[in-house]
Amino acid sequence: VIIYAFEYARRHNRRKVTLVHKANILKMSNGLFLDTGREIAKRYPDIEFEDMIVDATAMKMVIAPERFDVIVTMNLFGDILSDLAAGLIGGLGVAPAANIGDSPAPTAGAPADPPCAMFEAVHGTAPDIAGKGIANPTGLMLSSAMLLDHVSQTDAAARLRTGIMSALTSAETRTGDLGGRANTQQFTDAVIAAMR
């Protein structure tokens, strides 16, 4: 996962990788994670590397989120920090997610096929609000943009992101969870209109 973070940073022109840990307390598991991260970082001199204890990371994400670029951590801390990040940008309704493997799908033919991946909205299916027209589809749409990037359809991904940002700028087309007046379909229609 640490190598992936650096490769992701390089591929997406990111300038810094922050490794988040609790090695001061969890000396064996997190200590190994930290030591491994420091060794791997030496292979990427073009990318700034820092390590940070998880509680300090949570505070700094709230105070100065712009100081972070790529964060790599273990699952437990990742779950917590990703929900914190979602809260900073408007809630789980706007947060995309991806699970990306390190090899192509078993049925893929060409060696250049992208790694097997799954993209989803962080909030899951939200069955409690299904059919009510109050769901915010932003997270799912941004996950779709990530999927498009993943399969090298970057122009389509950029168009989708532009459409989403356009719809989010007005209370008339923003969903209620973000202080807007639009329902799910109205927001979706606004995104589509902005993409034309």
Named regions from a protein language model:
Residues 1-55:
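Glycine-rich phosphate/diphosphate-binding loop of Rossmann-like nucleotide-binding domains
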Residues 3-7, 62, 145, 192:
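Generic structural signal for well-ordered alpha-helical scaffold segments
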Residues 30, 137-141, 184:
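Short alpha-helical patches at coil-to-helix transitions and adjacent helical residues
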Residues 38-42, 165, 196:
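Class I S-adenosyl-L-methionine
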